[in-house]
Amino acid sequence: MPWSMKDYPASLKNLEKPVRKKAIDIANAMIDEGYEEGRAIPIATSKAKEWAENASTDEIDDFLTHDDETERDADPSSGSGPELMNKAEHVIKHKKGWAVKAEGAKRVSEIKDTKKEAIERAKEIAAHKGTEVIVHLADGSVQRKIKTGS
């Protein structure tokens, strides 16, 4: 059963609301990908804190207002979860740098300062899923495809 803002691990109780919600969202996704709870919680907490430090006020407000941390289970078209496990990871230009986004996802999974960092992160995700990375130029056209091997 996924965690929610009403039912979450005690270690998240002292986090600010946006950080807690993001940590729950990330931890739920990690559990879906096969991570153990004991590993997922600290990793998700760290990533959520990093996200909150780098996110704009508008992005945080949008996340708090619109994102449901348990949506992946109730709505298969939510843009996350098991149906994206066989999809390639794309590296695309973003207003804040370079983003990593699963093919067919509604939202980017991460934003990095440099294209190189985004490609490295996309390779990690794709290798875990056994899919490929598709790197785009700033204009959106495909620059190259990288096979990661499963």
Swiss-Prot record:
Protein name: Uncharacterized protein YdaT
Upper classification of the organism: Bacteria, Bacillati, Bacillota, Bacilli, Bacillales
Biased composition annotated in UniProt, kind: Basic and acidic residues: 63-75
Ranges where the record places region Disordered: 49-88
